[in-house]
UniProtKB/Swiss-Prot annotation:
Keyword Manganese: no
GO MF term set: RNA binding; structural constituent of ribosome
Signal peptide extent: none
BP-aspect Gene Ontology terms: translation
Region annotated Disordered, chain positions: 110-130
Taxonomic superkingdom: Bacteria
Feature: compositional bias, Basic residues: 116-130
Entry keywords, A to Z: Ribonucleoprotein, Ribosomal protein
Family statement drawn from the similarity comment of this UniProt entry: Belongs to the universal ribosomal protein uS9 family.
Transmembrane segments: none
Name used for this protein in its record: Small ribosomal subunit protein uS9
Pfam families according to UniProt: Ribosomal_S9
GO CC, alphabetical: cytosolic small ribosomal subunit
Record gene name: rpsI
């Protein structure tokens, strides 16, 4: 593809996102759809825009994103992580600001597995004394 393109991979829960950044007018395309069409919820859109707003690049970069797996919140988090990594590849001086905001660290929280003998991960069956 283009020479002046920067790449970042982001993950969150069971979602993974591939983010390509290049200088442009501020278009954000996710799985061949616009940000507004892909994410119906405003909170998810805010999460995606967070790293760009932090470094004042909202209207200066075009983003092409493919994301797979998980739900809305996980995908939004994965995209945010991917954008952060791509921005660091684009300009290493942004790393400290992004680190302070907490976008660089991968959120390792995921669903706890269901255990044998329990109803859910921690929910026990009802106990009857008599």
């Amino acid at each position: 593809m283009a020479d002046n393109q920067y790449y970042g991979t982001g993950r969150r829960k069971s979602s993974s996102a591939r983010v390509f950044i290049k200088p442009g007018s501020g278009n954000i395309v996710i799985n061949k759809r616009s940000l507004e069409v892909y994410f119906g919820r405003e909170t998810a859109r805010m999460v995606v825009r967070q790293p760009l707003e932090l470094v004042d690049m909202l209207g200066k970069l075009d983003l092409y994103i493919t994301v797979k797996g998980g739900g809305i919140s996980g995908q939004a988090g994965a995209i945010r992580h991917g954008i952060t990594r791509a921005l660091m590849e684009y300009d290493e001086t942004l790393r400290s600001d992004l680190r302070k905001a907490g976008f660089v660290t991968r959120d390792a929280r995921s669903v706890e597995r269901k255990k044998v003998g329990l109803r859910k991960a921690r929910r026990r069956p009802q106990f009857s004394k008599r």
